[in-house]
Every structure is written in structure tokens, then in C-alpha cells.
Amino acid sequence: MDSATGGNDAGTPTARVPGGEGEPHSPYRDARLGCTDKKLKAGVTAEGSAPGALGSPSQRTPGVKVMDPARGPQKQLPRPCLVLVLLNPRGGKGKALQLFRSHVQPLLAQADVSFRLMLTERQNHARELVRAEELGRWDALVVMSGDGLMHEVVNGLMERPDWETAIRKPLCSLPAGSGNALAASLNHYAGYEQVTDEALLNNCTLLLCRRQLAPVSLLSLRTRSGLRIFSMLSLAWGFVADVDIESEKFRRLGEMRFTLGTLLRLVTLRVYRGRLAYLPVEQAVSKAPAASPPLDRQDRQGPVDAHLVPLEEPVPAHWTVVPEQDFVLVLVQLHSHLGSEMFVAPMGHRVAGAMHLFYVRAGVSRATLLRLFLAMEKGRHMEYNCPYLVYVPVVAFRLEPKDGKGMFAVDGERMVSEAVQGQVHPNYIWMVSGRGDPSPAPEPQWPPPSRKPQQTPPPEVSL
């Protein structure tokens, strides 16, 4: 869902972005990017800085580390700070670059946030970039797209030889895709009202300007075929995954694609047979594992999944096993929102050290399921006390689809349907968030004050 290309469309070459710092309304802002210039295709990027000459390099000395690897980052980004912005120009409605110039760049200028802008060209481009990037140059990585691009960034960081240090680089989510669940959750944690589109982007940009950091959890997933995947948001199987993946063809509608996809899927409601097991929070606390299980002894690329045993073995005796049956959906959720208007986990901002497990058993009527999803906008779906809907806070789970039926969606990205298990790692990643001590820095103004045009015109770009 809105990864590097927002699908499999041809990507846009990484190009120098015209239009100066603080000049979102310059005559160059509508310049097209799809040029054939070899230098642009080689990956020229845009640089901006808080008030100064157009395109001037940042004042930060290159190569200076901005965090202590032994302690990780502090609770606040420095002022001024330098960030790397990874932006998918084709995600969602295809307006991310325009939104960056008009909504994000002016606020960053006021807040002394310098940036370098890189446009992704294809699926997994962001993953490749962060895998090879010299992270010590940046105070934070800013991801402007949907949830899929953040998924790429996190997995790219976890694939680095220095993953233990790399994953502690602060991350920031700026919504510009069709799926913006992580940004909506951070907006909720900051105490803002539930909003969408440009209003959500404004709120998340203000969070970056305030520089506050908060730790969030990471979900480690392992499949029967040996894949290890890391998730920032969710794993879905059944109805939610079907809607997420099958509505990709409507992604130009933005988040309306999910409403349309839900209605279409309700017409022909599917059920999937499988087995589910999970480790409830209370059992994890009372019966913590004494040692690392065998599956981690030869896998040191990532944190130890101490609650998991190999998929070939039965789950431990203190786990809860749901008998094999037909499910409409299974959803494992780390955060409050599944979309900007889907308040799926109103039980609390974040369950400390846990994740939300929902499943809906077969037998639920289409009308009831529709009512649940409509009530989810305000987080009131649990008030229905629907006997087919089950919710449990867990720290680990195992899900085994029968005969590989159905689709998995991890952070909105399709994953092969096979047996999978996962464990949450609490407070593992630092995110720009509204949770923390108030910043002494002045609040950026929105709309930003008008600024005099730069005297030096922006550089010419071959189109």
C-alpha cells in the first residue's frame, strides 16, 4: 500500500526539485519530473535549508553523528536539525511532491529544519537507499508517502550490518498516500482531533517542527518458508487484507479506496479456515521464557524473539489455542488506527509491551459487519458487543491458514499466504511524536507568513 511506487507503475526519476526554500508558490512548482536527462536519472536530489540562500547546503558538518549509539537518541531532535526526506511522488493521489512544497517546506523553514529531499523511483527503492545511506549525516529520516514506504524504510534499516544502531535513528511519518494509519495514530497520540488529508499532514508536520520523540513498538514476523519481516503497524488476514490489496486499483481515490473496497467485498463475503494461537499479556508476564528458543540461535539479524518456538513445533503450553475454524478476518494491530478514519483500537493510546489482536468468526452477517466498520470511524465498534468479534491484548501469536487460502497484508503490503508467527518488541523505534515534554521552541505558524521572493532564480531543470 503506497510503497515506493504506490503499486507497480513506472517510477519517476529522482530529480532536483525546483522551487526554493520557502517559495512554494514559485512559477517552477508545477515543473514535471519525468525527464530523460541522464544526470537526473542518476539520482540528483533536492536540498533545502531553513532561511538562507536557495538550495544552499546545510550548515551541519557532514558525517557528524547525531546520537550516541550506546544510549540511542535523546527525547528531542536538536535545533537546528538536518533530516533526509524520502518521498514517493506517485503514492496516493500522486500529489505528494506538490503537498511537500505547499504544506511542509514552509513550516520546516520556520522551525530551522534543514532537509535533503530524495524521490523514490520504484518499489523497494527506499529500502535500498536506507540500507546504503550514511545515517550519521542525519538527525532523522522523514518518510512522506503512505504506510508502505515506512515499511520499506524499517526493513531496510533492519537489513544493515549495523542494524542495532540504525534502527534507533528517529523516524517521522508525513502522510501523503492512500493508507496513512501510522500518521493517524501519531496524530491521535498527540491529542489532535481525528482529521484526514491536508489537515493530517499539517498536524504531522507540526510534530516534526516540535522535535519531540517517543518510542514505539516493532513487530517481528517469521513465516514457514523462512522469511523474517518487520512491521510498524499491522498484519491482516481475511477481510481487511482483501480490501487493502484488492483496492490498490482505486488508489487514486486516496483513502476513499478503502470505503469502496469494503462495500465491494461485503457483496461477496469470504471466509477462510485456519488455526490461531496467541500469548495473552498476563500469561507473558507470569511465564516469561527462561532462555532464547532454538530458532534464534542462528539468526542474529534482528532482535531475539524469545516467546517464539519453531513453526514446526506446537506452541508452548501457556499459550491460548483457538480451535481450527472459519474466520472472516484476523488482525494484529500495533497502533490505534488502521486508516485515517479507522479508529480500530480505542482501548488506549498504546498497550504497553503488547499489541491488539482482533478476529471475527464466520457467521457474522453482512449488515453487522458493515455496522462494525462504520462505527470504527469513531472507535465505537466495541460497544456493539458483537459475539463474533473477539479482542485480546497479546505479545505473540501464530496464524496458520489452511491450504494457504487468503491473503496477508503487512503494513498494507501483500505477503505470501503461509503459516506465520510474530512477537512484539516494545519501545524499539524512536518516532517523531507529540508525546513528550513541551518544546521550548516557538510554534510554527499555519498558514506560514508570506516571504519575499528569492532574488536568485532556481536552477534550470531539463524536462
Which positions does each model-derived feature cover?
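ATP/NTP phosphate-donor binding region
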Residues: 1-144, 151, 155-158, 165, ...
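Eukaryotic basic, amphipathic alpha-helical target segments in cytosolic regions
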Residues: 108-116, 134-138, 149, 161, ...
